[in-house]
Structure formats: structure tokens, C-alpha cells
């Protein structure tokens, strides 16, 4: 079995793991997440610890993946995930209009982004966007979609970038 799959998933207080024949659901203070249960992977719950095992040798590889996804689901419903974006550039601004995000990114019109269900958007400052949610994959997808509106360009670094992202700069053309 893979090294990742051998490691048990600990369930913090307030998190409930429910395994059915076709579905695995994790319920916690931040919401409920579900995962279709792959065939050949067994999930055993012993108190506040869940362990995974493969029934079939061909399913050993997927067991580690399922364990990692399950651990992310447990962390998501207990603590949640967040991704911070920064707007770099003159006149680049973000503001909330109700639950929608309005972005001024140098286009002739403001972009309005509607947050999908389960994702919370906020703007601590005019040049910062905070994407929060219980599902790690959806938080990353939404952050990537917002970043895709105006990815950072390599000459001046203007655009929407992840917090802490290093933009490799190019030198301007010499005359």
C-alpha cells in the first residue's frame, strides 16, 4: 500500500464521517462535503480515526489519493480553506456588490464575478481578494478563475496574482 494511504485520517471534535456503499460524506461546523466512494477502497472508522485499505492490488494507487482527498475534506469542514489574491497595477480595484465581486482591471467595463455556492468572497482592502470555503478544490478553482481575468504580465508585474507568488520579470527591449 502507498505510504500516504497507510497514514490514518484523524477526525477532530465536531466532525462526523459517514461511509455508505456509494458515497462518503464529511459533516462539520463549516458544512458538508461528499465524495463518490471508489470501488476497491475500504474506509474503516475507529473512534476519531479513519483508516483506508485497498481490496484489490490494482486499487492501491487510488487509495493514497482518496486518503488525501478525505483529509482535505475533514480539514475543510473543520477549519476551512482560503486563498488570497493581490491586485497590482494603477487603477486595479476590487469591491463587493452584495455577494458579487466587482473588479476594475483596466478594461473598458468592470468585471462582475458571481461567487459559486459554498464559496465566500471578501475584499479586506481594495487591492486584496480573499476566497474562502470548505472545499479545497473549489477554492482553488475560483481563485484561478479570478486570476485568469488579468494574469500578471512579466514586464511590470501588473495583474491579479496569488499572495506570495513571485512573478519572474523580463527586461525591457533595449533600443
UniProtKB/Swiss-Prot annotation:
Part of the 50S ribosomal subunit. It comes from the Bacteria. The keyword Chloroplast does not apply. This is Large ribosomal subunit protein uL6. PANTHER family: 60S/50S RIBOSOMAL PROTEIN L6/L9 (PTHR11655), LARGE RIBOSOMAL SUBUNIT PROTEIN UL6M (PTHR11655:SF14). Transmembrane segments: none annotated. Belongs to the universal ribosomal protein uL6 family. GO terms for biological process: cytoplasmic translation. Disulfide bonds: none annotated. NCBIfam families: L6_bact (TIGR03654). Keywords: Ribonucleoprotein, Ribosomal protein, RNA-binding, rRNA-binding. One of its GO terms (molecular function) is rRNA binding. One of its GO terms (cellular component) is cytosolic large ribosomal subunit. This protein binds to the 23S rRNA, and is important in its secondary structure. It is located near the subunit interface in the base of the L7/L12 stalk, and near the tRNA binding site of the peptidyltransferase center.
Amino acid at each position: 500500500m502507498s505510504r500516504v494511504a497507510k497514514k490514518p485520517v484523524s477526525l477532530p471534535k465536531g466532525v462526523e464521517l459517514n461511509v455508505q456503499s456509494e458515497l462518503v460524506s464529511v459533516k462539520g461546523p463549516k458544512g458538508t462535503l461528499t465524495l463518490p466512494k471508489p470501488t476497491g477502497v475500504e474506509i474503516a472508522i475507529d473512534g476519531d480515526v479513519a483508516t483506508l485499505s485497498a481490496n484489490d492490488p490494482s486499487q492501491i494507487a487510488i487509495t493514497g489519493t482518496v486518503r488525501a482527498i478525505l483529509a482535505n475534506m475533514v480539514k475543510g469542514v473543520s477549519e476551512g480553506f482560503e486563498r488570497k489574491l493581490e491586485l497590482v497595477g494603477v487603477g486595479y480595484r476590487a469591491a463587493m456588490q452584495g455577494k458579487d465581486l466587482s473588479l476594475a482591471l483596466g478594461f473598458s467595463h468592470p468585471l462582475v464575478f458571481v461567487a459559486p455556492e459554498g464559496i465566500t468572497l471578501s475584499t479586506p482592502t481594495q487591492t486584496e481578494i480573499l476566497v474562502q470555503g470548505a472545499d479545497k478544490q473549489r477554492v482553488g478553482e475560483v481563485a484561478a478563475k479570478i486570476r485568469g481575468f488579468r494574469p500578471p504580465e512579466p514586464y511590470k508585474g501588473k495583474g491579479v496574482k496569488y499572495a506570495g507568488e513571485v512573478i519572474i520579470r523580463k527586461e525591457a527591449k533595449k533600443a
